[in-house]
Amino acid sequence: ESVALEYSRYNYNAKNLYQADQFRASDHDPVIIGISASGTTGGTATLNLLNFNDFHGRIGKNLTVPFAATIEQLRAEHPDSSLLLAAGDSIGASLFNSSAQKDQPTIDVLNALGLKASAVGNHEFDQGYDDLTGRVIGTDGKRNAQWDYLGANVYKKGTGTPALQEYSIQNVNGVRVGVIGVVTQETSTLVSPGGIKGIEFGNPVEAVNRVARQLTDGDESNGEADVIVAEYHEGAASNEDDATAKPTIDEQKAASPVFKKIVDDTDPAVD
């Protein structure tokens, strides 16, 4: 797992740019999909989906440069069909270079890299919901983060009303890519309760499935997508005593009921 390509704050010195195992953030290969694109029938389109998670404000000469360079290298291989996405915790629990400036350096770097959409992670709520929406995301006409920050399972307390944008539609190479973002339901136990007193966190799989059905119901007025990507900010079980262990999907499902539900119950409409 590469620090730049498949970013994890637990791995700093790995050498491989790509490992085709269950721990990869995405496959980093162009995805060939059979769809009707640009008015044609029976056509295919190439999508190069680039994904990272848990960046945690790793701003530094030996971290930011290789991370950014790898993204640019992969994007250059498919300049018209690449889409940069993230699965949350881009900010929070950051290095001093970023945390001392309330993660503004990280936001600036990700803006420059052309991040298009990201799930919120639990650390996006470290400074509270108001800070996330008012400063990090910003308001209409004065955006800070230039990507769509998504939280389909984040609701105004006591209601089913979304507290954040639920999905983003990105047009890539003639394909409408619907990106749905959700965060762990345990977020309320991981951050200060005072900062999230007006919101609550629902079941992430149920939220993904609800939005996926909306994006495939044939009604253009509520959003439609040719391809759906779910960005889950959620973790599978890990064995910190054996970093070389490579458990199978079935072993991971047995070790983590949450991971099992994601794998087994996410709507098949999600690609």
Which residues make up each language-model segment?
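Acidic, metal/ion-coordinating pockets
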Residues: 7-9, 16-25, 39-271
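Conserved beta strand-loop-helix elements of the APE1-like EEP
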Residues: 1, 35-38
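Intrinsic disorder/low-complexity detector
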Residues: 13-15, 31
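Short beta-strand scaffold segments in enzyme catalytic cores
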Residues: 31-33, 168
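Short, conserved phosphate/pyrophosphate- and ester-handling motifs at nucleotide-, phospho-/glycolipid
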Residues: 28
